[in-house]
């Protein structure tokens, strides 16, 4: 006889077999649930990446005819005033260009008598101006409606986003402190570091064009010189507050690599 009675060994073996037989389906069920959640989360993320382009194209094609009809039939005083002011400015620029052409080509006509070429150019300027206005208004409506739809889609899919972010957190925390610091430093330098002023210029210029703002180099330069600095300071403070309690060595490595 051994030190442990055979009855106890048989009992433990029976319990182990029963436990494994019960836990097997449970494990498969949990794996199946995790697989379905992962598939739903990936589909949601793919839709979230593709949806803005689809919404923009569909809304633009459906809204532009309405905006064109509204622009051609409406006669609001404010819009007429703005149209008149902008058209006069454009006319002034065209007149300067035409005067320069006259000086070069030595036209025999006097400047006070406009030629058919000048009238045609001014007519084209008016058409281009109206086309630009319709384009800007269409973009405004498209962006606001698209933003509302995407916000609703994000609110409805918070659980799926939470699953995706849990994967990212799990992957991030599974790395070593050196790799964590390297990943954080790479992301900050690419997005808000001193290596990305041109990217910020393109982003701000794209936003201003989509929302109908006039391109202004001074405003863009001031935003590029201040906004990334503020974001960088906030991000460093967040790293210090969050990771100083979880992993102080990560904060030390990050500051050493950043220097």
From Swiss-Prot:
Which keywords has UniProt assigned to this entry?
Antiport, Chloroplast, Hydrogen ion transport, Ion transport, Membrane, Plastid, Plastid inner membrane, Potassium, Potassium transport, Transmembrane, Transmembrane helix, Transport
Q: By its UniProt entry, which InterPro entries does this protein fall under?
A: CemA
* GO BP terms: potassium ion transport
Which reaction(s) are listed as its catalytic activity? K(+)(in) + H(+)(out) = K(+)(out) + H(+)(in)
**Membrane topology, as annotated:** Multi-pass membrane protein
Report the principal subcellular site. Answer: plastid
- Provide the transmembrane region boundaries: 47-67, 136-156, 184-204, 219-239
Q: Which GO terms describe its cellular component?
A: chloroplast inner membrane
A single MF term (Gene Ontology) = proton transmembrane transporter activity
Query: Subcellular localization, per the record?
Result: Plastid, Chloroplast inner membrane
Pfam families from the UniProt entry: CemA
What role is this protein assigned?
Contributes to K(+)/H(+) antiport activity by supporting proton efflux to control proton extrusion and homeostasis in chloroplasts in a light-dependent manner to modulate photosynthesis. Prevents excessive induction of non-photochemical quenching (NPQ) under continuous-light conditions. Indirectly promotes efficient inorganic carbon uptake into chloroplasts.
Family to which this protein belongs: Belongs to the CemA family.
> Which PANTHER family is this protein grouped with?
CHLOROPLAST ENVELOPE MEMBRANE PROTEIN, CHLOROPLAST ENVELOPE MEMBRANE PROTEIN-RELATED
Q: What is the official name of this protein in its record?
A: Potassium/proton antiporter CemA
Give the gene symbol. Answer: cemA
């Amino acid at each position: 006889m051994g030190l442990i009675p055979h009855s106890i060994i048989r009992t433990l073996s029976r319990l182990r077999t029963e436990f494994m037989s019960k836990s097997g389906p449970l494990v498969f069920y949990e794996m199946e649930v995790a697989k379905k959640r992962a598939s739903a989360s990936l589909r949601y993320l793919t839709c979230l990446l593709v949806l803005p382009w689809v919404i923009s194209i569909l809304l633009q094609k459906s809204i532009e005819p309405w905006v064109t009809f509204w622009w051609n039939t409406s006669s609001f005083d404010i819009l007429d005033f703005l149209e008149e002011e902008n058209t006069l400015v454009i006319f002034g620029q065209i007149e300067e260009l035409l005067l320069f052409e006259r000086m070069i080509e030595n036209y025999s006509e006097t400047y006070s008598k406009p030629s058919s070429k000048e009238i045609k150019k001014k007519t084209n300027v008016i058409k281009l101006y109206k086309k630009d206005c319709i384009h800007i208004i269409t973009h405004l409506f498209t962006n606001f409606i698209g933003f509302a739809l995407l916000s609703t889609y994000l609110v409805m899919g918070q659980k799926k986003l939470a699953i995706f972010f849990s994967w990212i957190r799990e992957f991030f925390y599974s790395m070593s402190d050196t790799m964590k610091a390297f990943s954080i430093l790479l992301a900050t330098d690419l997005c808000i570091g001193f290596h990305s002023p041109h990217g910020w210029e393109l982003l701000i210029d794209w936003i201003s064009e989509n929302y109908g703002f006039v391109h202004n180099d001074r405003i863009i330069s001031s935003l590029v010189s201040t906004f990334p600095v503020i974001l960088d300071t906030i991000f460093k403070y967040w790293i210090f507050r969050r990771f100083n309690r979880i992993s102080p060595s990560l904060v030390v490595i990050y500051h050493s690599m950043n220097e």
